[in-house]
């Protein structure tokens, strides 16, 4: 698409007008985005909107930091970091665990800031308070309430897998986190077949199957690889028979399969199925 645009611009007699039009549209768009950022920034400062990723402080702050970093707006990076420091330090054990409106989302946000090089400090200490709350809350989930808490457990497991994958915890904690992750996968896996039967609307992150596949992919390298390989072999016929109706769900599933195929030697049918999920379209 960029080459087509360049050919139009550089061969057009009105290239100056085109340049000005493109620049004007970009300027208007950026100004509009910055107006929204300012409104959201003052909203989270004024109100107790929660410090979470979805409609909360962490979500606003992460976007401000991303925008400032990518468009050389240092002010937005600094303001985003400042509101995280002010608003995201008052977490309680009663808060939810999920990504959108829970502690896992905050922890993943901090992990992203560290991996992106935006915060230059060890994050094990920063995340230890959140981790303590997560461990305590998971330990209180009974076998009878596993089904009700499946989404939260799936989010927690993905978070722990990423902590281990990116070595963001101390060597002493590695063994504890690895055992905790193995326990979570053993909790979640029996409900795998229910995940296959449920396609959420309108789709996207709430679709559990891609998250489960991503969890398996991210969990390799933690002393229970043989268990993960057996899980892949067991679920292969069922996963390769899935064709979600919603486009967002098909793309999410295809992406998770490709991530797994990139790191593990899988039957060729996995890659073929991922391609089919992307290429074949249905009305929605």
Q: What does each model-found stretch correspond to?
A:
Residues 14, 20-284:
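Glycan-recognition and catalytic cores of secretory/periplasmic carbohydrate-active enzymes
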């Amino acid at each position: 698409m960029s080459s087509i645009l360049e050919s139009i611009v550089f061969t057009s007699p009105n290239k100056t007008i085109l340049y000005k039009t493109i620049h004007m549209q970009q300027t208007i768009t950026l100004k509009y985005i910055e107006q929204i950022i300012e409104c959201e920034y003052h909203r989270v400062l004024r109100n107790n909107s929660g410090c979470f990723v979805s409609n909360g402080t962490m979500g606003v702050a992460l976007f401000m930091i991303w925008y400032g970093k990518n468009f050389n707006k240092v002010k937005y990076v600094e303001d985003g970091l400042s509101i995280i420091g002010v608003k995201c330090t008052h977490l309680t054990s009663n808060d939810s665990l999920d990504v959108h409106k829970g502690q896992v989302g905050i922890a993943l946000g901090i992990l992203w800031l560290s991996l992106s090089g935006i915060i230059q400090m060890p994050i094990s200490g920063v995340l230890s308070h959140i981790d303590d709350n997560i461990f305590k809350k998971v330990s209180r989930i009974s076998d009878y309430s596993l089904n009700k808490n499946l989404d939260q457990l799936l989010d927690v497991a993905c978070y722990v897998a990423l902590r281990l994958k990116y070595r963001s915890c101390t060597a002493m904690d590695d063994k504890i986190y690895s055992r905790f992750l193995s326990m979570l996968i053993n909790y979640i896996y029996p409900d795998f077949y229910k995940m296959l039967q449920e396609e959420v609307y309108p789709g996207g992150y709430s679709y559990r199957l891609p998250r489960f596949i991503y969890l398996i992919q991210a969990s390799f390298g933690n002393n229970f690889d043989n268990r993960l390989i057996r899980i892949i072999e067991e679920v292969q016929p069922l996963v390769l028979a899935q064709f979600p109706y919603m486009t967002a769900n098909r793309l999410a599933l295809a992406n998770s399969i490709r991530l797994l195929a990139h790191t593990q030697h899988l039957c060729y049918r996995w890659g073929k199925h991922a391609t089919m999920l992307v290429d074949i379209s249905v009305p929605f």
